[in-house]
Amino acid sequence: MSTRDLSVLISVVLIVAMLVIPFPPWLLSILIIINISLALIVLLTTMNMQEALQFSIFPSLLLLLTLFRLGLNVSTTRSILSHGEGGKVVETFGNFVVGGNVLVGLVVFIILIIIQFIVITKGAERVSEVAARFTLDAMPGKQMSIDADLNAGMITEQEAKHRREKVAREADFYGAMDGASKFVKGDAIAGIIIVMINIIFGIVIGMLQQGMSIQEAASHFTMLTVGDGIVSQIPALLISTATGIVVTRAASEGNLGHDITGQLFAYPKLLYVAAATIMLLGIFTPIGILLTGPLAGLLAFGAYTLSKSGKEKEEVDEILEEEAEVDELKSPESVVQLLHIDPIEFEFGYGLIPLADANQGGDLLDRIVMIRRQLALELGLVIPVVRIRDNIALQPNEYRLKIKGNEVAKGELLLDHYLAMSPTPEDDLIEGIETVEPSFGLPAKWISEAVKDEADMLGYTVVDPASVVSTHITEKIKQHAHELIGRQETKQLIDHLKESYPVLVEEVTPNPLSVGDIQKVLAKLLKEKVSIRNLVTIFETLADYGKLTTDSDLLTEYTRQALAKQITAQFAKENEVLKVVTCSGRVEKAIADGVQQTEHGNYLSLEPDISESIVRSVAKEAEQLSLRQETAILLCSPPVRMYVKQLLERYFPDLPVLSYNELEANVEVQSIGVVDI
């Protein structure tokens, strides 16, 4: 235990001891001086802080200081009633401060109580309640704002974590202050009751036990009690003032003194007006110019000084700003910063700004946060922050999505319309602006809100603009997810897996497979929309086969077969037949014969007429399935699967190509078409 911790514990024990153990008057005097000093230090600290959280210990400190002050009250009361003395400090405040006049002392004490209890304490208590309520109410909004800034790339993950912690600390602090302000209120009430008890029982004890007359007892004990009351209420008043400063303090870049002088005297012209008013007050009233003249002159001089220094500061700021701009242009770092490319960028025209502006009801930022979470669960990949910005070069209603600086999607939105898609494309039952749904290329119409209900009743799928663009972003990120996983992202996934499966990771990397080898396998899986969330199974497979080969194509095939249950669930519905298009024996033989083996790996080399024949056959089968509104899935034998995919990828990028080993044995498969040559 450190010395600081020990000193605090000893202090608390001494405070408790004050309640039960009689202390000599000289020790009480020292403790009273310490009490006043602590109260003054707390007040000065609150005035010097820039935000409330810089003094987050204040609620607990307030409790300890209140307990300390009440312990002093109990000890001084015991000393006054038992021995008729309260120590040098109490006697000094009773005689010197109030001039030895009991009535004056009582009046001063009552005024202090009124100031503390009715003015400062009551106000601080109310402000604490309101601050706590509004802080708690604002928490969800602040959290959403942090997520939006993180999603827009304005802050890093570390900064977002720090801000979230700060929001939580603010809520805890103001919640604690709401309760701690009751200590101050209770302390003021206790001070009044203690003074009344001291006076009444002091007179009784003086008369019955010490043989004093009622006048002597009243004078002696009232003087000591008033001194004790004032000496305890002064630090109490300082603490109450500190409480008020803490709960009313807004976060700023300077302390209280800096902010007061900076804001109160921010407009020198107003000081001239105040100086003239004070001068006129002395001229036209009996107050006299001798009293008002010096103050008016001081205000006028201050206004002149502030005005002059303000102009000089503006000139200096302009010069420094110009120099900074020149230095920035000359700096090589300013050019280097231009080389940075954001992984994902979403740009939109000025007409779509309401989509991203929360003040105008836009929730695009929140939707993108949800998209990143959804894709993390679905793909097993942490999607980078999406940089969102408006682009004046685009049409007002136009947007585009870039991945690593390359445009991958583009579209237009009508914010005051809804996108309606008919279940049967040939239907034309509602009026609207003809368009194409951007995510899946379906025919659609932009309809006004007036016909939205009618479209719903007719069976149309009606979607708002924000949902349209969110779906478009989601599908395009899925389509290009393999471009977003590099070696750095792969290393992060490996490190995360290593926390739970260190032995497995050590068996795979750095030997026999490098981070680059693993990255290629993960990218190939994502390219065919296979989730990499099950990293344990993927690494188990790589551990088994990585010793045999480092060919990323072969490792990917082994991994796909290990993920058979996942792939089956992705394409086959439970208790339903999986309808597929199969490859004929001639097609598979032609592809197998066309595989060329080299020292750098295998590749497919087919005669142009054979390739063209296979592509035409696949196109024919896909068209027939499309007319029947069925999904096309191509099934072939394991040895040729990856070569079939390579052949068809250019023409049918979204066509799933599966092998028999990638489907579980309990899945019923039905061939509804054959690819032949």
UniProtKB/Swiss-Prot annotation:
UniProtKB keywords: Bacterial flagellum biogenesis, Bacterial flagellum protein export, Cell membrane, Membrane, Protein transport, Transmembrane, Transmembrane helix, Transport
UniProt subcellular location: Cell membrane
Gene Ontology, cellular component aspect: plasma membrane
Classification via Gene3D superfamilies: FHIPEP family, domain 1, FHIPEP family, domain 3, FHIPEP family, domain 4
S-S bonds: none
Annotated membrane topology: Multi-pass membrane protein
Domain of life: Bacteria
An example Gene Ontology biological process: bacterial-type flagellum assembly
InterPro entries named in the record: FHIPEP_1, FHIPEP_3, FHIPEP_4, FHIPEP_CS, FlhA, T3SS_FHIPEP
A Pfam cross-reference name: FHIPEP
Transmembrane segments: 6-22, 27-43, 52-68, 104-120, 189-205, 230-246, 275-291
Known function: Involved in the export of flagellum proteins.
The family this protein is said to belong to: Belongs to the FHIPEP (flagella/HR/invasion proteins export pore) family.
Protein name: Flagellar biosynthesis protein FlhA
Species of provenance: Bacillus subtilis (strain 168)
Gene: flhA
